[in-house]
């Protein structure tokens, strides 16, 4: 990767590069969720959906996860994530990378299950891959089949047009056994005058 540099968050090192489409390689507003993952991943098998450069995966391994399975349709993003793990000397055998479009098939993710933690952090609307309003239901239905009893789910929505109630309704309908635990607070580094337009992260127990 050209012109790359390194950044550090809570002792973990990340490869960064000048913004491309507003992305430097790490979504900074998701820092509270990375902290939560690290605090709750011990001895868990973690499924990281729409993993991008695997920031949540780094947090999970640092927090004692047994295994993390990273899924994203972008192979370059997952290769970047693999470099991030190597930068932190994480054991390669504990981390899997699946460059695959979930909207076409779930079998690659299913073969590594069941899981005891899942992070779902999809793009709001990415042409050719995912539309949150139309396809979040499919993700929740499939994820519900992959989880062990007493597992944890971090369910994210990063849309200025869809609110907390949308996410609550989706989970209630398509993942009915999920029990709401909390909304994670937004990062103080990214104050939002209209909270419904900011990143929304609901924590559930299945």
Where are these regions (language model features)?
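S-adenosylmethionine
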Residues: 102-174
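S-adenosyl-L-methionine
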Residues: 73-119
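Conserved SAM-binding loop of SAM-dependent methyltransferases across substrates and taxa
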Residues: 53-66
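Conserved SAM-binding motif I beta-strand of class I
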Residues: 67-72
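Conserved alpha-helix/loop element of class I SAM-dependent methyltransferases that forms part
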Residues: 28-44
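Conserved class I S-adenosyl-L-methionine
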Residues: 43-52
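Non-catalytic substrate-recognition/targeting regions of SAM-dependent transferases
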Residues: 1-27, 35
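C-terminal catalytic and target-recognition region of SAM-dependent MTase-like enzymes
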Residues: 152-206
